[in-house]
């Protein structure tokens, strides 16, 4: 049996999405900026995409900017807004557990003279609103907080954060990295006081290399690339029409059975975690065992620390059995360094190199979960014995 449980890294493309993209690439392949019929046919896909995504978010079509994915969207939001608003102030706020696309961009902005406050999180990976309130200064211009953490699945109180920011200073911009949240939660930027929001297609069964950035109509932001002036001069470059069409169809398909699929994912998550706790020396991160509330976390992510077994050893042992997981964020997995998220939640040092991530999708079945648990029941005691002998 082959079991893919690394859906926070990327998801399998819906077959219908692949079919549509093939049609766009082979038949409707015109440049959307061209004036002839082929160009106008391609442009229709972009118009339809903006209309569709705007309806899902309850925003205006002109507030959707297509990008190459989450990293570009994050960079565009942070650098573009920081540079455009620096006369009002040079203070930025984020958290200690953001995606590298946020943290590394913040580090870059620090070299450009900006001050950055990194908010701590509790053991469940959530910020405290009191810490945010204390951190906001007269020269704060932007706050960036992720919707769902990609490593442990912690869920931030985004609506409450947005309300707090706007109550303290309506001019502070609020950016949300929703790469792991879009398609798992119904997100309405205007209702939640979100000014900018990053989304990536390949986390919702769409193609890689495409995403979008929601930019509120009143947001002042500079472009970070220059060229032909596409997308109202905010993101130059010929639009990825097949990718945009595929992403839009994927989003539509995700929303068709939204509540049903999310209920299924939460049921699988609860079932899996109960199975994990039947083994000795196991710890699920981002949850408090005595007061488990699965709905206060993302439905698709489970971070597990396995006492006495290194994460890379377990990852490859499971791979040999056809089970594919992650030892952390795939976006930074090629770097042998300890996860900042695991440090921030206060995970014991002995677990830093013994933590793995399972992440589910609408394709995940209970049979796959049972197979994974049974393999782990047999495998982990043997790996621990081998580790002790060494």
Model segments located where?
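Pyridoxal 5′-phosphate
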Residues: 1-390
